[in-house]
Amino acid sequence: MDRKVTVHEDGCPVVSWVPEEGEMMDQKDKDQVKDRGQWTNKMEFVLSVAGEIIGLGNVWRFPYLCYKNGGGAFFIPYFIFFFSCGIPVFFLEVALGQYSSQGSVTAWRKICPLLQGIGMASVVIESYLNIYYIIILAWALFYLFSSFTWELPWTTCTNSWNTEHCVDFLNYSSTRAASYSENFTSPVMEFWERRVLGITSGIHDLGSLRWELALCLLLAWIICYFCIWKGVKSTGKVVYFTATFPYLMLIILLIRGVTLPGAYQGIVFYLKPDLLRLKDPQVWMDAGTQIFFSFAICQGCLTALGSYNKYHNNCYRDSIALCFLNSATSFVAGFVVFSILGFMAQEQGVPISEVAESGPGLAFIAFPKAVTMMPLSQLWSCLFFLMLLFLGLDSQFVCMECLVTASMDMFPQQLRKRGRRELLILAVAIVCYLMGLLLVTEGGMYIFQLFDYYASSGICLLFLSLFEVICIGWVYGADRFYDNVEDMIGYRPWPLVKISWLFLTPGLCLATFFFSLSKYTPLKYNNVYIYPSWGYSIGWLLAFSSMACVPLFIIITLLKTQGSFKKRLQRLITPDPSLPQPGRRSPQDGSSAQNCSTSPVKQELIAWEKETHL
């Protein structure tokens, strides 16, 4: 576009933008382009973000990491990363979305065209998440439907899928004492591996499609589609239920868990501090990666959700509250998990360490085994899998919403028209469903593990976080971004946030990133099955496909821009002049200012000429 400056009679210059040839759009097309929309109120934004960041990892990952890494001592490195990385980067992404009113790709493109690959990388990660995360919902639906029986099907060894090595819970202790068989299995394990997954011997043998899981996956996608098909108008209403219902289930399970025999021993096992574990660098790496996982950082979701805020929304206060809510939920979930694991260990007469699990092993093996030992086991099974379903559901459809938002902001003239959004969501759902069918084959679990271990791994998130804080702190300028934030919320955030962007966060991300690489251990399914070399190659391809976006788009944008290298670099680190500048009111808030002392031209020139840290 060309900039056109006119001067009013009062002497105030006004900037307008004239489309260049090829950018003209007839009036009919203009009228058809719909507005992005905004949240109806703050609560819709808060619940949507809470639904995205508070998910399955809070229940099945954090408690296990806490017990594994020194109990209460784990909170020391956890809160160091919480204040130096979690809150600063979380706030950065939300504020960026609110400031630019754009999805992940176009927001970074406007802030710094040279580093727009950050946004593209987040879209790649979102795409992977949309393919594999919803598989967990299909499993949860399968277990939920299986819970509506007189006897839970994973209680006994008399089912058609059980083998001669199956030993039910009543005979478990005596079998252990007699060493009846070194290869004995439990009915809950056989239900999981033989009835639900039908798992094969390895990734080389995918087997046939598990049609029941395929139907559950289809149902999950249908639910997700109708949760977001009308944009923030529908998403904002759905999260009132999906984001709050898991808390009701969590409270019910907490009350039930702490009243079980053996619960106290389980909670002590969860929280008893072992300060000597802090000497192990692995503890610190686990704390850092857990922060990035649980806060949904570098996935583009926070930027997209923040983009639907009003310009003067206090996103700083919201971000801090949401971060504390997320960590508090993880902490409380630990009481639920370990009170029930303590009960299960006491009932079986084994140490708690033998029943402690993380990930799918906790959700689909340990907990189903625990509920069979309770009175009214069908009720507790239904409640638990309903909680899992809703914990994962809002994370899934909000992630899909953010992917759609990024796409529509990249191509507004084509996609932001009547009926186009619904078709885009339908197309994304169909493509992701068809690709997801590969993960509900008999060998699909091996592929799921590759996605989970590599596609959205801590290495990818740490790498992108490093470039995010470098972009805002050093290229765009931390002081300049603080000016933008002050213009939005009316005051400047705590100085520690800026210090974190400039020094603490990049330092910790870089150190943790290289340590993660040095301590890399190849994926093993159940710590037994070793993938073939081509399987690991696929995993690393998934990881590098997102990280490679940053250097790749740096090279592409430099090659496409004309001029000397210095001029190209200067142009590519210059923010888009259409971004709001301090003193210029946002049109979406219904106010405008024509003040000569802070004219748009003057503000724009200040923004363009202000030196960056680079």
Curated annotation (Swiss-Prot):
Extracellular compartment spans: 138-210
UniProt entry keywords in alphabetical sequence: Cell membrane, Glycoprotein, Membrane, Neurotransmitter transport, Phosphoprotein, Symport, Transmembrane, Transmembrane helix, Transport
Domain of life: Eukaryota
Glycosites: 171, 183
Cellular component aspect of the GO annotation: basolateral plasma membrane; cell projection; plasma membrane
Predominant localisation class: membrane
Molecular function GO terms recorded: gamma-aminobutyric acid:sodium:chloride symporter activity; monocarboxylic acid transmembrane transporter activity
Chain positions with Phosphoserine modification: 586
Transmembrane segments: 45-65, 73-92, 117-137, 211-229, 238-255, 291-308, 320-341, 374-393, 423-441, 458-478, 499-518, 538-556
Biased composition (Polar residues): 588-600
Assembly information from the UniProt record: Interacts with LIN7C.
Family (UniProt): Belongs to the sodium:neurotransmitter symporter (SNF) (TC 2.A.22) family. SLC6A12 subfamily.
Protein name listed in UniProt: Sodium- and chloride-dependent betaine transporter
Organism taxonomic ancestry: Eukaryota, Metazoa, Chordata, Craniata, Vertebrata
Gene this chain is encoded by: Slc6a12
